[in-house]
């Protein structure tokens, strides 16, 4: 009996101990976020896309995938906004299943506020709802090249139009639901048209307040369902003071919005020609941030190593906001895959469009080395 009681006591003591947790991957401490932002595949590319995720991203320790869907989904809430041959619910569920199985956080993106057109093409929202246009007198069919007298790069919707968010939030909610997403990327980069004189609602208003108001409205809507907002960071940087210019930063005074937006908005801080060190600026402003690279392999590797160094050399509060690195691809998935295969020697190399694929190869190698 005495021996039985001793064994029982030992067993109870063992059961009271906290469960052992698996050892964390070393790269999780060095670089918590390791992402890719890319256009969603066309339906005919689904098998190749899933093979790419499983064969390339998983083994390289990627844990975030941002998919630019825009109007390429078969929206039930607003069928008029569908692009031709859009992804179906079943297509998206296949992507969700692979990412969930492999521990990859999947985040859908629709460009909000800006990027409502490209060159001569007006995208679905303003095509179907022209009353939402911030400056309707500027016609995309008259686009020639940049720069141009009308300052047309991409159209914007009016953030103060009383009906725009009813439509926008319908499709955002539908997309987040089908993706099972706990975050949404709203784009919001390169917004040149904002607070325009011809807009009866925005004319004369502070552009920083307009931008911050739209960010906050979207963020608050997402937060109601426990979702986080992600945006590109360029409009929150002063292009003149930093010397970053009007693309990677702002010339139209939206940069002051950095002090007006909620502190849980995730900033994707993109720089493609140099490894500019603005990630620390966002972190010291209280915002979570990841550095984003594109087509220069040397710059991309430096951005990753800088982020690792920043995290090591910062106070814990700041280091926690320096989240990691997100690689970007700015073409359709099909053309990119051909370039990527060429960069691996699997296809004929396209010299004119090779660097973005080689940059991803460099990122994969850097992630892999950090994980060892």
Which ranges hold each PLM region?
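Flexible loop residues that form catalytic
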Residues: 9, 41, 70, 272, ...
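Positively charged n-region of N-terminal signal peptides that target proteins for export
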Residues: 1-4, 18
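N-terminal hydrophobic targeting/anchoring segments and the immediately downstream early-domain regions
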Residues: 20-55, 59-60, 64, 135-139, ...
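Histidine-centered catalytic/metal-binding microenvironments
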Residues: 372
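Catalytic-core regions of glycoside hydrolase
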Residues: 63, 178, 182, 193, ...
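Bacterial N-terminal signal peptides
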Residues: 7-16
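Aromatic-lined carbohydrate-binding surfaces of glycoside hydrolases
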Residues: 37-251, 257-259, 265
